[in-house]
Curated annotation (Swiss-Prot):
GO terms for cellular component: extracellular space. This is Complement factor D. Residues 224-228 are annotated as: Self-inhibitor loop. Circulates in plasma in a mature but self-inhibited form. Activated by factor B (CFB), which displaces the self-inhibition loop. Associates with CFB complexed with complement C3b. It comes from Bos taurus (Bovine). CFD is activated by the removal of 5 residues at the N-terminus, named activation peptide, by the MASP-3 isoform of MASP1. The self-inhibition loop inihibits the serine protease activity in absence of factor B (CFB) substrate. One of its GO terms (biological process) is protein maturation. It is an enzyme of class 3 (hydrolase).
Length: 259
């Protein structure tokens, strides 16, 4: 009996370690999006490899998450627009160089607060059916709990680390902040600058970070992840609320236009 108990403990600890080591950044239990159905989506790339999502908010500006490029020192940052497949030739695809990388000044590696990043493209994006701007929320109000919102990305889709070549998406219901702040969930760490969505085995995380949480055709939030394990219903997905940063976003883009 003692040997069996010890064996069970070892299995539990091993399972816990494996879960902790599994890659964050996956759209879990999503599905492939219809081709070019989300023409605002951007692939933020470093040295030619996808690292995060993003979305086009102005002809020369892409929104993403600050922690996406925290560990990038000398890498070449570029943005791919007009893509459904990351690897296959598509007439609409174009890779843009980045002129400026502007993380929110309050962003820090040890926290997910202020987790926003603006990327100024070296030239204006060529708009068309597969490349479009996404309106973003400027009115400072909370999205009603239960509202179904869309998230999309190219993050890994399984615990084995398999990466999709084509854009994936899923719908997630918004969770009210009070519930998200319960001790059993995020224990009071969710500020008014953040919002949550349910994550019961369906979720997005770091590999999809920077992509938009789209509610009613408007970007309400930006995907962030922190250190949580994705797909855990006790750790709802966390998103940066764009409406809390209108002045900063407008100011950065105005400064870029004047440069």
């Amino acid at each position: 009996m003692a040997d069996r108990s010890l064996h069970l403990v070892v299995l539990i600890l091993l399972g816990t370690a494996l879960c902790a080591a599994q890659p964050r950044g996956r759209i879990l239990r999503g599905q492939e999006a219809p081709s070019h159905s989300r023409p605002y989506m951007a692939s933020v790339q470093v040295n030619g490899k996808h690292v995060c999502g993003g979305f086009l908010i102005a002809e020369q500006w892409v929104m993403s998450a600050a922690h996406c490029l925290e560990d990038v020192a000398d890498g070449k940052v570029q943005v791919l627009l007009g893509a459904h497949s990351l690897s296959q030739p598509e007439p609409s695809k174009r890779l843009y160089d980045v002129l400026r990388v502007v993380p929110h000044p309050g962003s820090r590696t040890e926290t997910i607060d202020h987790d926003l990043l603006l990327l100024q493209l070296s030239e204006k994006a060529v708009l068309g059916p597969a490349v479009q701007l996404l309106p973003w929320q400027r009115e400072d109000r909370d999205v009603a709990a239960g509202t179904l919102c869309d998230v999309a990305g190219w993050g890994v889709v399984s615990h084995t680390g398999r990466k999709p070549d084509r854009l994936q998406h899923l719908l997630l219901p918004v969770l009210d902040r009070a519930t998200c702040n319960l001790r059993t969930y995020h224990d009071g760490t969710i500020t008014e600058r953040m919002m949550c969505a349910e994550s019961n085995r369906r979720d997005t995380c770091k590999g999809d970070s920077g992509g938009p949480l789209v509610c009613g055709s408007v970007a309400e939030g930006v995907v962030t992840s922190g250190s949580r394990i994705c797909g855990n219903h006790k750790k709802p997905g966390i998103y940066t609320r764009l409406a809390s940063y209108v002045a900063w976003i407008d100011g950065v883009m105005a400064e870029g236009a004047a440069a």
